């Protein structure tokens, strides 16, 4: 198979994309660019290069070279997809025994962690009233209770939205999460249906206590499971994760903190500040409901008393009600 034959196969494959699959000219242009790069890699193997000689090892080497150049995982994945399709087509045209791209994967995408706020900024965010809202309104009191609890306990926004005032089980409904104000503890159901209990700091407890009388005024008859919800909208329905996200965003904007503040930023700030204050990674993983750092998906077994001790010593908002 000479260079002319190789080019003929490339042209034939691109023609098939236009004819049989009816791909757009822009998409075919992208395929052509990726295949030219494959040809360049193959030519570098030696003078007598041919596609039939390309092996699984070569493809892995090509992908590694792309990664070393700084190409993103998504771009490498696109090229591998184009190459895989070409070799599938080539196997139909020739005696190619196997597809050398099969099983080769692009490097995993690195998910950047959300930016953590400085402790002073986080406290300012959750403790300050919204200058654009009435300090005594139901919305203002609900917002402060929610934001304090997000940062105090490092909850996911879905876990916060699912909280009930107390554990409830009736008429086929069972609480996924609830708060124990007397015990200063919140219990939630996290990923993988794993339940965990997390301490709640004094400022969050006080903010929730201030919200509860307003909550009672929003309750309506025949609300079903909404009646158990800890956080309610002005219409008396359970607060959704989306509404919580929007409220936090608008609150941060009103305080001049920024437009990209979101609930997970408070969760990440909780984790960062706990680690900075305690250095106890295993305890923080347990508080967050994460798998171990070794990605074993096994939760670290620490008793709640130990978690509470770490929390009290390390968290900047862990001051007890009695410590006012």
Feature-to-residue mapping (PLM):
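Conserved catalytic core of the tyrosine transesterase superfamily
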Residues: 1-324
């Amino acid at each position: 198979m000479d260079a002319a034959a190789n080019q003929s196969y490339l042209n034939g494959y691109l023609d098939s994309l236009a004819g049989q699959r009816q791909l757009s000219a822009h998409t075919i242009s992208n395929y052509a660019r990726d295949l030219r790069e494959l040809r360049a890699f193959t030519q570098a193997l030696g003078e007598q290069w041919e596609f039939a000689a390309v092996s699984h090892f070569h493809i892995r080497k090509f992908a590694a070279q792309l990664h070393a150049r700084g190409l993103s995982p998504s771009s490498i994945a696109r090229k591998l997809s184009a190459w895989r399709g070409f070799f599938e087509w080539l196997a139909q045209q020739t005696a190619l025994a196997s597809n050398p791209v099969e099983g080769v994967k692009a490097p995993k995408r690195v998910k950047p962690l959300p930016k953590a706020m400085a402790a002073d900024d986080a406290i300012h965010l959750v403790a300050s009233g919204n200058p654009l809202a009435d300090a005594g309104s139901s919305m203002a009191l609900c917002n402060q209770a929610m934001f304090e609890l997000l940062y105090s306990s490092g909850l996911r926004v879905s876990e916060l939205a699912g909280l009930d005032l107390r554990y409830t089980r009736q008429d086929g409904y069972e609480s996924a999460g609830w708060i124990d104000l007397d015990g200063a503890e919140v219990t939630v159901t996290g990923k993988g249906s794993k339940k965990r209990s997390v301490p709640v700091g004094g400022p969050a407890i006080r903010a929730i206590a201030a919200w509860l009388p307003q909550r009672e005024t929003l309750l309506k008859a025949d609300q079903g499971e909404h009646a158990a919800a800890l956080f309610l909208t002005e219409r008396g329905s359970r607060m959704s994760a989306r509404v919580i996200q929007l409220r936090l965003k608008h609150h941060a904007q009103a305080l001049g903190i920024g437009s990209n503040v979101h609930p997970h930023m408070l969760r990440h700030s909780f984790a960062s500040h706990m680690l900075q204050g305690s250095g106890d990674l295993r305890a923080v993983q347990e508080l967050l409901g994460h798998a171990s750092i070794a990605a074993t998906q096994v939760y670290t077994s620490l008793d709640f008393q130990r978690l509470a001790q770490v929390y009290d010593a390390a968290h900047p908002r862990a001051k007890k009600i009695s410590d006012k």
